[in-house]
Curated annotation (Swiss-Prot):
NCBIfam families documented for this protein: GTPase_EngA, small_GTP
A GO BP entry: ribosome biogenesis
Subunit relationships: Associates with the 50S ribosomal subunit.
Keyword annotations: GTP-binding, Nucleotide-binding, Repeat, Ribosome biogenesis
Organism of origin: Helicobacter hepaticus (strain ATCC 51449 / 3B1)
Ligand binding (GTP 2): 209-216, 256-260, 320-323
Protein name: GTPase Der
Job description of the protein: GTPase that plays an essential role in the late steps of ribosome biogenesis.
Entry annotated with the keyword Iron-sulfur: no
SUPFAM superfamilies noted in UniProt: P-loop containing nucleoside triphosphate hydrolases (SSF52540)
A GO molecular-function descriptor: ribosome binding
Domain EngA-type G intervals: 2-164, 203-374
Region (Disordered): 459-487
Amino acid composition bias (Basic and acidic residues), ranges on this chain: 459-480
Length: 487
């Protein structure tokens, strides 16, 4: 697959072009210079051929954080098959822009000068001043008004020689259409059953925590490279940044989400970032909650952790900056258990992202938690445990009426979801459900994994009584989410 990188100084419209081409609002855009800080990747289609597009941070001479952003952007340009260097058509050509452009020219790869914000012919006349760059290919566009983009796409198609790939793709598609499929229904179903589900092959891991607890450093340590920009400046990550790696043959995708601040400090582009954080977690299997061991936990840590039951994710708690811990292990764990009783089922790991302490252990733990997250209990074993639980602690009656559990079945995984079939579904107290879940945790290794337990009626009358109170899994109420955390 061919790769295209969009480079240029801050605030020239790189992220807007990125969003326009991929037809999604994936990169956060703003009038604030330097909004994009990490390289974002997405695929889009040009005349039937898929290409990868990279949205990079602005290139400038700033030091510190933005020097790292510039370095990452230039590196992305070196790895791409085509570079679109973007400038602002409303601004006269700048010497540093020319210098950056000519530096990229030395790489001897296809390079296009894209002049953005050319909203009308008057601006286009002025924009001819950019001929001083010495670009072989120069295109005038306006992302905001969707002007000149079709011509730019045609140029990209030719520069990347995509016609050959399009021809190959069309020939393959035609060949497949002409083949006779003589498999029986049974054979076809057999193929489906033996084919692994791609969504289950790839493990999606979200990394959450408040600002500056070391999430980006942790992501870089896991990947073994600087994928996410790290800085002492609080709130460096704005867009969720994702990347993939193999861990013992399993494909794992990490998402480093925006650091979460107090609500009173959330404004502008950070509001969009928080919405995107929730969206990223909605597609994750496991969440790593990063806490700062160099200082006491705060109320905001607890509020952030409330995102976890909402999405019913596998959980790993990471006490980062352990090399600077403010208390001894026993005291910190005691404080953790006091503040986060609803995470009692989660493994807690101490590590230092900066020096690499326990990073390999964390990788192994991710695989273990996912295995539990995807585990299906054999029905016979499940019912044996339920029978033992009932025998050990009888179900309380409902005002003298006997409550029975007939049987149990696990109807879904990711996370484990179990239904109990009862004669009186509404009479099974939440404390008894918690007891059942604790028994399941005791008998089966479900560390780090939520267990969702529901109770259903045995006959139509029971189902009718419960259906009115039942809600869609995607709209779990705050009350139910809270109860699930404690069971």
């Amino acid at each position: 697959m061919k790769t295209i990188a969009i480079l240029g100084k801050p605030n020239v419209g790189k992220s807007s072009l990125f969003n326009r081409l991929i037809k999604q609002h994936l990169a956060i855009t703003s009038d604030v210079s330097g909004t994009t800080r990490d390289v974002k990747r997405a695929c889009f289609d040009i005349s039937g051929v898929e290409v990868e597009l990279l949205d990079t941070g602005g290139i400038d001479k700033a030091e510190g954080l933005f020097a790292k952003v510039s370095a990452n952007s230039l590196k992305a340009g070196q790895e791409a098959d085509l570079v679109l260097y973007m400038v602002d058509g409303n601004v006269v050509p700048q010497d540093d822009d020319i210098a950056y452009f000519r530096t990229i020219q030395k790489a001897k790869k296809p390079l296009v000068l894209v002049i953005n914000k050319v909203d009308n012919d008057k601006i286009k006349q002025q924009a001819w001043d950019f001929a001083c760059f010495g670009a072989e290919q120069m295109y005038f566009i306006s992302v905001h008004h969707n002007r000149g983009l079709s011509i730019l796409l045609e140029a990209i198609f030719e520069l990347l020689s995509l016609a050959k790939e399009q021809s190959l793709s069309n020939n393959l598609r035609s060949q497949m259409d002409n083949e006779e499929i003589d498999e029986s229904l049974e054979e076809f179903l057999g193929i489906l059953e033996s084919t692994p589900n791609k969504s289950e092959e790839n493990i999606a891991v979200g990394i959450i925590g408040r600002v500056n607890v070391g999430k980006s450093s942790l992501l870089n340590a896991l990947l073994g490279k600087e994928r996410s920009v790290v800085s002492e400046v609080a709130g460096t990550t704005i867009d969720p940044v994702d990347d993939e790696m193999d861990i013992e043959g399993k494909r794992v995708r990490f998402v480093d989400t925006a650091g979460i601040r107090r609500a009173s400090k959330i404004w502008g582009i950070e509001k969009f970032a928080l919405l995107r954080t929730n969206a990223a977690l909605a597609q994750s299997h496991i969440v790593i909650l990063v806490l700062d061991a160099s200082e006491s936990f705060v109320e905001l840590d607890e509020k952030i952790s409330s995102l976890i039951p909402k999405h019913a994710l596998g959980v790993i708690v990471v006490l980062n900056k352990w090399d600077k811990k403010h208390k001894e292990y026993k005291e910190i764990i005691k404080e953790f258990k006091h503040r986060f009783p609803f995470l009692s089922f989660a493994p807690v790991m101490t590590l230092s992202a900066l020096n690499g302490r326990n990073i390999d252990k964390l990788k192994k733990e991710i695989l273990k938690v996912y295995q539990r997250f995807a585990y299906r209990i054999p029905t016979s074993a499940l019912n044996d445990v339920i029978a033992q639980a009932v025998a050990h602690h009888h179900i309380p009656s409902d005002h003298g009426k006997i409550v029975k559990i007939y049987y149990a079945t696990q109807y879904a995984t990711h996370p484990p979801q179990i239904a109990l079939v009862s004669n009186r579904p509404e009479s099974l107290h939440f404390s008894y459900k918690r007891y059942i879940i604790n028994m399941l945790r005791e008998q089966f290794d479900f560390e780090g994994v939520p267990i969702l337990l529901s109770v259903k009626g045995k006959n139509a009358k029971d189902e009718e009584n419960t259906s009115a109170k039942k809600e869609s899994p995607s709209k779990v109420s705050h009350r139910e989410s809270k109860n699930r955390r404690f069971v």
